[in-house]
Curated annotation (Swiss-Prot):
InterPro entries reported for this sequence: CRACD-like (IPR026713), DUF4592 (IPR028030)
Protein name (database record): Acrosomal protein KIAA1210
Extent of Low complexity compositional bias: 595-608, 1502-1513
Compositional bias of kind Polar residues: 494-505, 514-527, 886-941, 1288-1299, 1332-1350, 1366-1376, 1457-1469
CC terms in the record's Gene Ontology section: acrosomal vesicle
Region (Disordered): 207-226, 239-275, 451-663, 763-973, 1211-1382, 1408-1516, 1539-1571, 1589-1653
Location in the cell: Cytoplasmic vesicle, Secretory vesicle, Acrosome
Source organism (scientific name): Homo sapiens
Keywords assigned by UniProt, alphabetized: Cytoplasmic vesicle
Pfam families (alphabetical): DUF4592
Domain of life of the organism encoding this protein: Eukaryota
Signal peptide span: none
Biased composition (Acidic residues): 777-794
Chain intervals with Basic and acidic residues compositional bias: 473-490, 651-663, 1542-1552
């Protein structure tokens, strides 16, 4: 140690080391000190804090084992996440980095002589050693150290196995200590901190009491955070107090009750002086003999204990949970001398309930260093701390909690700051502490200063503290101090005493005596009730305190934002700060509340206790981290702290107001709690029926949570976060807010969390109110009346809708898997810094705890996205309407009619009516699945409210689909769909009809239909109509009937009916609807294309996870345009095999919806037709709508759905599709793309989604592009779909031609597998931006691909149908013939993203093989059709390339679409002809390419990645937003390139790399398509590679080659970005590099033969499309330039291909 300290393995420091020296606190560095000292340093903790376990005289002891206990030996753990397990074993939830304050002041020897505390500790970990001159205590200390050594050894072992058995090791250690100290074990019960990951059961070093035989040894489970920050070991100079051991975490002093009482007496003095410091935040041992010797280092506070009284005071941050400790603390609290009694922990497992409450209290505070805020209060309440050695451990681990709270009071910003706190002349430097904020530190400094602490913490009376001992809440009422302590105890019990103490400190200022036990109980409840306004709190208490915490938090923030407005959320910074400071204290408080809730508290307590001991340990740590993040995200929202909140609890604490502000906020909160306790009671009474119902549901929820086995944990975490929100609510009291919370509680725990999301998501007060109303309805899934009541109460406050949102979210979380939600939430949280977003994040955290943290977070991310959209959309009425429909949906689970009525009511609303109806259908849709699913949907729909009414409808369909498939998907998709809502109010009427549809049909069908109806609203009525047929497919005649009901709605209502018929159509017969759609004019064609894609996705019935990912992607896409919004809806639909399909179709329709009201009428007619369940009627309805320009789109969507289900119908519609209007087709295409992504795994969907989102901002086509991706992902191979989607998006920007090419590719993929349809949609999307004709051609292409089962017929029909689109029929034919190529393309696209590629390659490998055999023939036979595409390409160059399949692309590119690409294609094809010879007879460009594809099937397989990259590059070009996505797509493409390279050849890989380079510039896809044309050589090399590639060596080689090719291609991206001419030059260079790489590949041909076969087909298809696209976009001259270098390469490749083709033949076979 510094100052010449000699390392002795010195967790225990030998006083003899400095016998004559002036006692001082030596700072132990976290790592270097440990290294120098030779002690074992655990730097893996929060910061580089090392757990310095120095024992005995073993200087080099890494383990810190005690040698023979020396009188001077003292164990001094460096502060890190709890002294004991600061590190690896206990990931620091509090201490996030070196900046966190981890210093632990250990005072050894007689602290009376303590002269000074050494300066600031090493950033995060500082060990302050106070060495006393008097070493008389050392023998006792040595004895205690001997005991400690054993315990520490056990703990050390636990630390080594930190992640495995930290509690087990501690347990065993405590057991040993118990055996050693039977008396003390009885007297001092081991307290177990229940911190999910940070809780550490630490047996405190028990200094052997010289006078007392009792060995103070208590198992002290301390949150590593609290310990790491708050732990201070204060040893009394007396041998007994010398025995007052220092424990790595809070020292659980196991002294006799006498000792404890004595210590308590000693502690009250310090508490009166620095009660908060010693009792709460200062988790270190308190010097007992030295009045100034007591040093509290953990939270920057320092407490001085009177030196006259030596006590082994182990200040355990609010970790004291077991009842045994409660007993011990009762004794201690009698003395009220040791605010560190919380360190004493009774058997954590023996008294589970007490431990649960304690763990809840202490773990929340300990885990969340926001407890440091309470630590500040606890410093005041340290005197109040009932925790004493003589007092049994109670839920009031006030001392420990105080430490944690105090640190929480210290804002994270203060972590980096060194705060010099002078306590009785003791300057203590606190290095930046994670939980310390500057303001908090200032407050702490004031608090730490004896006068200041007393002032800020008026509840600190020394005398009172002895009366306030932690006496298991019995002594609470003994005196005011006791009552205050009880209040704190209640808060601590519910939320670790320190949190409560912090609140009580202020409350004590206001109502110290009044609130005693009652206030304590009501505070444990009422504090959250302050935020929840009693009712909600009670419900939460009944169901889960954690949920209420999250609910409160969200609503409190919402209330603040409502009071101040979204912009005012920053204005509510004091409240937010309070919430931030309180949140962790609230976390434990929540838990305490869960124990204390009037009726449900016992239920909650027991399961939570178990969860606290079991899951809460690991989960609460994560929950606390997440909770701190949540608090940070939610509370900083008012302060624009979303980023910091989301990112880290530190920002949360940083953003937390200064300690003074916190104190003020707490004081106001205390007043609010007092008033709210009454208000809560009143609210509970007013919502009595709801509350009762809710309480029953809360029990039910508890059961459900138990079923989930982590619901209680989630509820606890939610309560914790809700505590923070409650603090905010208290700061900003609002009867409406209380009512709102009550209504949210009415909903359920999950509803509560969702309510928070709503509050955050719905900035408008009116919107919030509307949302809250539906929340009540959601809560009353069992009885509609109750939810209605909840609605009435929730309407009072603006945050009601957010409350209902929270409900849904909670339910959704419970229903769905939490992992995906967590992922989405994390991304969303980070992405969305908006206050609303952070608020939503807070809720998801709670939900996360409720089910799985990950799942809810993912969902929450969706909410965040919605929040951002809400912020973007200032509309309040829509949000309100949305909130109501959600409630109605939930109620509809009980009775569908009620949701309809609610929908009607919402519709009746003047300006909010449209959005409200939308919300209602959503609620109904959700209800059928389950209350949880409903909650998810509702919360999502609530979030979109702020943006637009249309946006809301989109949210609902997604939610429904997700509910059908799985809660997880629902949550994610829901938030995605919410984003699309912003477009228009059209969605509102649509949502209402949808709701009716859902109500009309089965609950599930209703949900799906409603969702679908909502989704189409955003884009246009025509999209809605398209959506309706799809919905029909899912919910048969019932959905149609509902659609009919919707018809009465205004013009928008017309679109609603259309959606319903669609839904029924999807349900009953997608094929049938497809056939009726066929007659639809070209305009209609576009929507049908979308629908078939969705239907294809239906067939695949993607996983919920992939749906979730897609939704996230969708969200990103939706933000830019309505099309992207529709895409999100489609994704959601895809999730459920049945409902997903219907929803997807609805979404597809939804994307066309934006066109016009005609679509609405079309939907209406469709609904009627579906009611009759006649396909002809549906077709007629489409025809009827055909007069309307956008109706055709809807009918065409139906037609597309039919095509998907029936190849013949798909072929028929292919012709019809071509006429689709350019705009509508783009929308429908967008949806398919999104769906494509949805199909794939969440991982693959996410990359696509990212690309999609980025591209969406560019234009609606890009947005629509995002959708098709999702369907493709959802469909069969999500991996391939993302790459393809990226390619399509990129192609969009370059040219319609490239888009058209992409679209055929997509279709081809759909034909071999449903996945191909998403690809087609991508193509459509890409076509959209260029022109309408290209879109139509894309659709026709998709149709043939979709009907790949009958490839020949389909391509022909589509060719004829798309003839007006020059490139449609050729591409369609090619697509039909080369369905395998579509699959191959898809594989290539998948290869663009490695994850997708891996999953899809396997599926497509078989298909590719099949197609490679039968696909080569079609390719060969297609040369003529390819020539047609060439011709068509000439007319609409871009379109032609787009519509063409792989061959079509090549042909089109070769034909020269009117762009230079054709020339390049021709040149490439000429090269191909030269190389292959077999294909040379083809049309100069197309035939050559086809020959190349046939011959160089493997080469083409490798090529696709290049074209895809080009496409992505184009998308990049198109818009800056696309660029980000393109980057993601480019990365995906590169990844897929790796996969393709692995399967194909090194050149293919290099090609992929080069193409991504080109891709980045965003040149038109056509240009890159030229590359694709030259890629057949690469394909040949890929084939060769694949033979030898089975080992990944070829991939590396390809990478190397691609680097060489990338150099040449690097220019090409630039040129591509510049223009087609530029592209040609890079292509030439790229071609050259391709040739070189191909040569290299020739050397590597044997690597992956099988892969080559599969990939060759795949590449053939994808590169053909891409090449055509590139050629169409690239000037012929440009392409010709590359042709020259390519020819030599082709010749070389001709040889290689001879080999490669032989390999391909083998692979294909």
């Amino acid at each position: 140690m510094r100052a010449g300290w000699t390392p002795r393995g010195f967790s225990a420091f030998h006083a003899s080391l400095l016998p004559g020296r002036h006692p001082y606190l030596a700072h132990l560095g976290p790592r270097d000190r440990g290294a120098r000292i030779g002690s074992r340093a655990y730097s893996q903790g929060c910061c580089s804090c090392l757990w310095l376990t120095y024992k005995g005289k073993k200087e080099g002891s890494t383990k810190g084992e005690l040698g023979p206990a020396a009188v001077t030996d003292l164990e001094i753990p460096s502060y890190s996440r709890g002294f004991l397990p600061c590190t690896p074993r206990f990931p620091t939830t509090w201490c996030r980095g070196p900046g966190c304050f981890c210093g632990t002041a250990v005072i050894a020897g007689n602290l009376g002589d303590l002269a000074r505390i050494v300066g600031p500790s090493h950033h995060a970990s500082q060990l302050l050693l106070l060495q006393e001159q008097d070493s008389g205590n050392h023998p006792t200390m040595a004895e205690s150290l001997s005991e400690i050594s054993d315990s520490l050894d056990v703990l050390e072992a636990g630390d080594e196995g930190k992640k495995k058995c930290k509690f087990k090791a501690l347990k065993s250690f405590f057991v040993k200590k118990k055996e050693k100290e039977a008396e003390d074990t009885q007297e001092e019960e081991m307290l177990e901190l229940s911190l999910s990951s940070s809780n550490i059961n630490i047996s405190s070093l028990q200094p052997v009491r010289e006078n007392q035989p009792t060995k103070a040894r208590a198992k002290s489970s301390m949150g590593s955070k609290a310990l790491s920050h708050d732990s201070i070991f204060m040893l009394g100079p007396e041998p007994e107090r010398s025995a007052s051991k220092m424990f790595p975490s809070m020292d659980p002093q196991r002294g006799r009750p006498q000792q404890r009482s004595h210590i308590s007496r000693t502690l009250p003095k310090p508490r009166s002086k620095v009660p908060g410091v010693v009792s709460g935040a200062m988790s270190g041992a308190v010097l007992q003999n030295v009045p100034t010797s007591a040093v509290w280092v953990a939270g920057p506070k320092i407490t001085e204990n009177p030196p006259s009284r030596r006590r082994r005071l182990s200040i355990i941050p609010p970790v004291i949970q077991p009842e045994i400790i409660s007993k011990n603390l009762v004794e201690i609290s009698l003395d009220d001398e040791s605010p560190k009694n919380p360190q004493k922990k009774a058997l954590p497992h023996k008294s589970l309930t007490a431990t649960q409450s304690f763990s809840e209290l202490s773990s929340g505070p300990d885990c969340s260093q926001s407890l440091t805020a309470f630590a500040t209060l606890a410093s005041t309440s340290s005197t109040q701390l009932p925790i004493g050695f003589s007092t049994p451990a109670t839920t009031q681990g006030c001392l420990d909690s105080s430490a944690a709270r105090h640190k929480m009071t210290l804002n994270p910003r203060k972590q980096k700051k060194n705060l010099q706190v002078i306590i009785r002349g003791l300057p203590v430097w606190f290095s930046h502490f994670q939980g310390i904020l500057e303001g908090s530190l200032q407050c702490v400094t004031q608090t730490l200063e004896t006068p200041n602490l007393d002032e800020p913490l008026p509840v600190e009376p020394k005398e009172e503290e002895p009366n306030l001992p932690l006496v298991s809440e019995e002594e609470k009422s003994i005196t005011k101090p006791k009552e205050i302590n009880e209040k704190k105890l209640g808060m601590d019990s519910a939320d670790s005493s320190s949190q409560k103490q912090n609140n009580k400190t202020e409350m004590y200022d206001k109502k110290t005596t009044d609130q005693a036990p009652n206030t304590d109980a009501s505070r444990s409840q009422g504090y959250p009730m302050s935020a929840a306004y009693g009712r909600r709190w009670r419900r939460k208490g009944a169901s889960v305190s954690g949920l209420s915490g999250c609910e409160f938090k969200g609503r409190s923030l919402k209330q603040s934002s409502e009071g101040y407005g979204l912009g005012d959320r920053a204005g509510s910074s004091p409240t937010n700060k309070t919430a931030r400071n309180v949140p962790f204290s609230h976390l434990s408080l929540e838990k305490d509340n869960m124990e204390q809730p009037t009726t449900s508290q016992p239920e909650t307590t027991t399961p939570q206790g178990l969860l606290s001991d079991k899951d809460d340990m690991g989960r609460r740590n994560a929950g606390i981290d997440f909770g701190s993040r949540k608090a940070s995200a939610a509370q900083p929202i008012p302060e624009n702290m979303d980023n910091s909140m989301v990112s880290d609890p530190q920002p949360y604490h940083e953003d937390a107001a200064s300690g003074a502000e916190k104190t003020e906020a707490r004081a106001s909160l205390s007043l609010m709690v007092e008033s709210l306790s009454t208000t809560q009671e009143e609210a509970i009474l007013s919502v009595a029926a709801e509350a009762q119902v809710f309480m029953n549901p809360s029990h039910i929820q508890l059961e459900d949570q138990e079923a989930f086995s982590f619901d209680l944990q989630k509820a606890q975490s939610k309560m914790e976060s809700a505590q923070d929100v409650q603090t905010i609510c208290k700061e900003k009291p609002s009867g409406n807010v209380h009512q709102t919370f009550t209504a949210s509680v009415l909903g359920m725990t999950s509803t509560t969390a969702k309510g928070d999301v709503y509050a955050k998501t719905l900035p408008p007060r009116s919107l919030f109110q509307s949302s809250r109303k539906p929340d009540a309805e959601e809560v009353s899934s069992d009885s509609e009346n109750i939810p209605e009541e909840g609605d009435g109460s929730e309407e009072l406050a603006h945050g009601h809708s957010s409350q209902s949102l929270g409900k849904f979210e909670d339910e959704q979380e419970v229903f769905s898997e939490s992992k995906s939600f967590v992922e989405d939430l994390s991304s969303s949280e980070e992405e969305l810094d908006l206050r609303c977003l952070s608020q939503a994040l807070e809720e998801p955290e709670d939900a996360e705890v409720f089910t799985e943290s990950s799942s809810y977070v993912e969902k929450y991310n969706t909410s965040d996205d919605c929040s951002s959209s809400e912020e973007d959309l200032p509309l309040r009425h829509p949000a309100q309407a949305l909130g109501k429909p959600k409630n109605q949906q939930e109620v509809s689970s009980a009775s569908n009619n009620t949701p309809e009525e609610q929908n009607d009511f919402m519709q009746q609303l003047p300006s909010r009516c449209p959005s409200q109806p939308i919300m209602n259908p959503t609620v109904q849709q959700q209800v059928p699945t389950s209350s949880v699913g409903t909650s998810i949907k509702q919360s999502d729909s609530v979030e979109p409210i702020p943006p637009r009414h249309p946006f809301q409808p989109w949210v609902n369909p997604k939610v429904e689909q997700e509910v059908s498939s799985s809660p997880k998907s629902m949550a994610v998709e829901e938030s995605i769909s919410m984003k699309p809502l912003p477009p228009k109010l059209l969605c509102q009427p649509l949502m209402n009809p949808k709701v009716q549809q859902n109500m009309f049909s089965g609950s599930e069908d209703i949900a799906v239909e409603r969702v679908i109806s909502v989704e189409p609203l955003l884009p246009r009525y025509s999209p809605q109509s398209l959506t309706d047929p799809q919905i029909r497919q899912i919910s048969e005649s019932t959905a149609v009937e509902e659609g009919t009901y919707v018809e009465p709605l205004p013009p928008r209502c017309l679109s609603q009916p259309s959606e319903r018929p669609k839904f029924l159509d999807s349900m009953s017969t997608s094929a049938e609807w497809s056939s009726p759609v066929a007659p639809t004019p070209s305009k209609y064609t576009s929507p049908p294309w979308v629908t078939p894609k969705f239907e294809e996705l239906y067939q695949l019935s993607a996983h919920p996870e992939s749906t979730t990912v897609e939704e996230d992607i969708s969200k990103e896409q939706l933000l830019p345009r309505h099309l992207s919004q529709l895409t999100v809806g489609n994704k959601v639909q895809q999730l459920s095999s049945n409902f997903e399909r219907a929803a997807i179709e609805a979404d597809i329709s939804g994307s066309p919806l934006p066109p016009q009201y005609a679509t609405q009428f079309l939907k209406r007619s469709k609904v009627q037709e579906m009611t009759s369940r006649l396909e002809k009627m549906a077709v007629e309805g489409t025809s009827n709508k055909s007069p309307i320009p956008r109706r055709p789109t809807q009918s065409f969507v139906k037609f597309m759905a039919q095509q998907i289900f029936s190849e013949s119908s798909a072929l028929k519609r292919g012709s019809d599709v071509a006429p689709l209007p350019p705009n509508l087709p783009s929308k429908s295409l967008s949806k398919p793309e999104v769906k494509h992504q949805v199909f794939s795994d969440s991982g693959s969907a996410n990359p696509k989604g990212g690309i999609s989102s980025k591209m969406l901002p560019m234009k609606h086509p890009l947005q629509s592009l995002g959708r098709p991706e999702d369907p493709q992902k959802v469909f069969s191979y999500s991996e391939r779909a993302p790459g393809k989607c990226s390619s399509f998006k990129e192609q969009l920007s370059p040219r319609q031609l490239s888009q058209a090419l992409r679209k055929p590719e997509y279709e081809q993929k759909v034909s071999p597998v449903s996945a191909s349809s998403p690809k087609e949609w991508r193509n459509s999307k890409k076509q959209l931006p260029p022109k309408h004709s290209s879109q139509a051609s894309d659709r026709s292409k998709f149709q043939p691909q979709m009907s790949s089962k009958g490839p020949v017929n389909v391509p022909v029909k589509q060719s004829s149908g798309e003839k007006h689109l020059p490139s449609s029929s050729p591409f369609q034919q090619q697509v039909h013939s080369s369905s395998v190529n579509a699959a191959a393309r898809r594989s290539v696209f998948e290869s663009n993203s490695d994850n997708w590629f891996l999953g899809r390659d396997e599926a497509f490998a078989i298909k590719t093989k099949k197609f490679s055999q039968g696909s080569k023939n079609p390719i060969k036979s297609i040369p003529a059709p390819a020539t047609k595409p060439g011709k068509f390409t000439i007319a609409p160059v871009r379109q032609t390339s787009t519509s063409g399949g792989i061959y079509s692309k090549k042909e089109d590119l070769e034909s020269g679409d009117g762009n230079n690409n054709q020339h390049a294609n021709l040149s490439n094809q000429d090269d191909v002809e030269k190389l292959f010879g077999v294909r040379l007879k083809r049309a100069p460009p197309s035939q050559k390419y086809k020959s190349e594809k046939q011959d160089n099937f493997t080469q083409l397989a490798s090529v696709p990645s290049g074209p895809i990259s080009s496409s992505v590059g184009r998308g990049h070009k198109i818009r800056s937003t696309s660029q980000g996505l393109l980057d993601a797509a480019g990365n995906l493409t590169k990844i897929s390139y790796v996969a393709d390279k692995q399967q194909s050849r090194p050149k293919s890989e290099s090609m992929a790399k080069k193409q991504p380079a080109c891709k980045t510039p965003g040149k038109p896809a056509g240009q890159q398509s030229d590359y694709a044309v030259s890629e057949p050589v690469w394909i040949t090399m890929a084939k060769q590679k694949q033979k030898s590639f089975k080992a990944h060596i070829s991939v590396k080689e390809l990478k190397t080659k691609s680097n060489a090719g990338a150099d040449a291609e690097t220019k090409e991206p630039k040129y591509e970005g510049a223009g087609s001419a530029n592209e040609n030059q890079p292509k030439k260079m790229f071609t050259s590099s391709v040739h070189k790489q191909e040569k290299t590949a020739q050397m590597k041909p044997p690597k992956p033969t099988k892969s080559v076969g599969f990939e060759a087909q795949k590449i053939l298809q994808v590169p053909a499309m891409e090449k055509e696209t590139k050629r169409s976009s690239t000037l012929p001259a440009k392409f010709q330039n590359p042709v020259e270098p390519i020819e030599p390469v082709w010749f070389s490749l001709a040889r290689k291909k001879a080999k490669a083709w032989s390999h391909m033949a083998e692979i294909t076979q």
